[in-house]
Amino acid sequence: MTMKNVLDQGYVRLVNHMGSDLTVANAARVSYAKESTELTEKDLRLIRFLAREGHTSPFRHAVLQFEVYAPLMVARQWWKYVVGSSHMEGTGDSLEAWNESSRRYITEEPVFYVPKSDEWRSKPENSKQGSGEILPNETGTKLTKELQDYIEEGLEKYEAALEDGLCAEQARLFLPAYGMYVRWYWTASLQSVCHFLNQRLKHDAQKEIQLYAKAILELSKPLYSSAVTELVEE
């Protein structure tokens, strides 16, 4: 399995990966000039020890690359938490890569996330952020239609601006941004991926990014079952 569909039109695709649970164990063992050729119970105990004691550098030697297609609001939350592999040991580099499609260069038909009538959530009672229970279906139906109308109006203005000769990098100002799907490549260490999962699988994370985190988990865990089990609090 290399792809998981998320939301109405989004997805996460595993593009590539490097290493395994054995990579983590051998990265730790190199300190003693030792190496295992196959994963044993001794290696699994070592991985558990590394995770439990917070010795995270061996987990950075395994790497995953994903292609993600998600609403802009999800992408910007995701970017905030792309910090897990950052150890700043002299390079100032977070050791991650993020490359995203840009409407400065492309004018393909925009795609937008539109929640269904039974997916609109109320504001929380005792918090400034997050959400509460699902709103009544009547209200949800009204909101879905209003959002669709808003998107259609923005698209008309965007397309008209392009036809008038406006450059793509400015024409995009007419697009309703937060629900617009964007596509990016995310390459990160196993430690960074697990850090993201611990942050965004939490019950108080925004629902939409929780769904993407679950997709990342389902694609990652079969590749590094021991390491992910030990590092991620499900």
Task: Report the location of each language-model feature.
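Family-specific signature for flavin-dependent thymidylate synthase
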Residues: M1-E234
